[in-house]
Amino acid sequence: MPSGVRKPVCVLLCLAAVVALGWWGRETWLTVEARQQIDDACGGLVPAERVLSLSPAGGTLTHRDSEEGTIDLDDGLPQNCEIFSTEAGEAYGTNSGERWFFTGAMGVLPAGPQVADDPLDVLVDPHGGPTHPYQPLGGGITGIVTDSGVVVELPCAEGEADGRPVTALWARAELMVTKPPFSENGQLTDHDRDVLAETAVTTANNLADRLGCADRLPDPPENIPALPEGPVPASRAEGTCAWYREGDFARSVRFPDQVLQSRTDDRLWDERCVLVLGAERAAGLYNAEVENQSYLLRPTAPGQWFVSLHTYSGERARNVLLTSTYGDEKPEPARPGGAGRSSEDPVWWASSVCAGQPQVHTMTLALGYDQVIPAEIKKVFRAYVTDVTERRGCTDVVLPKSSDFPFRPA
């Protein structure tokens, strides 16, 4: 290279190196600062490197600076931390330039009450779009995958929190921005779903270290599948709703003809099957009954008439409450070892014992639908409870009395 050219080239190369070093230095500083923000907010319990790999984690990260959105175990459990990013803010056009995109949460059991589904709950997409029922995480882990994140549970032998012994702990990793550009086909991206599972598991194990728990969770499975779409015809019921297809209940025009189902997993603290009347069946039943019923609510939204069935297991089964729709009545307990119905709402419960642990099974009917359902609904509840208890090898099954059906306020 001629000497007259060599000098300018060297200068350009040096300038390029300086620019590259400056860019690298700035990116390194931003990464270090982002990690610090996550550690400060989440008490060092949530893996910062995994949060930083989530799709909306670009740009500048900050955290909610308040007692409600930061974790300090000295303040007791449960707690959560909330992380913001400018990338999420730019994508959604927020005035502040940033947006809350991630929540890490944790807690222990025993905890507060579990409340059965409300007869006025909205359990399917009210606009007629697909609903994605939660699914078991799998991989030998007690956990669920939701439409926004992952929740895991870990037994906590020998652990202690707030000066009291605990039986288990839980951790949740959740994405707060689940619309484009941070989604695929209306769901979390495959990448984010896997990262959230890793984050939840690591958070649970870190909390186990702090609390002195003996056990640890294994690594979560890779390539966690997207959630299935529902509801589906009752003729295709599988998993938690397979018993409904096998019993051919949908042949009756008074019973639901669609289901929201999940894969079965006997480890789960809450396993669910939802039976739904499709628009045509709900309208037909309403038209056939409206002249015979006072104040019958017309089902105008998809899935407004439903039967929701849950099984609560272990520690959560010890503190289940039957919902109180109108809020002016104290919710009634659904105690293990018993069975019955709410005196206020169309909610029933049964109980059993599985592997030495209590189980509480609940059934909620949508308001309006409870006015037209025949007493044969007891056969549906019995079939559901039988399926769960036989699958799990349960004993001491207690079911509501026949006189508890159909629902009539006491």
Question: Model-flagged regions — what are they?
Answer:
Residues 2, 47, 77, 116, ...:
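Alpha-helix initiation/capping motif
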Residues 2-27:
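Hydrophobic membrane-insertion alpha-helices, especially the h-region
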Residues 25-117, 215-280, 284-293, 389-410:
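Extracytoplasmic low-complexity, Pro/Thr/Ser/Ala/Gly-rich segments
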Residues 27, 98, 168, 303, ...:
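Short, low-complexity intrinsically disordered segments
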Residues 86-88, 109-111, 157-161, 174-180, ...:
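Generic structural motif
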Residues 110-138:
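Long acidic/polar interaction regions in large eukaryotic complex-forming proteins
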Residues 134-213, 316-410:
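A short, solvent-exposed beta-edge/loop patch
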Residues 261-349:
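Flexible, solvent-exposed loop/hinge segments that line or gate ligand/substrate-binding clefts
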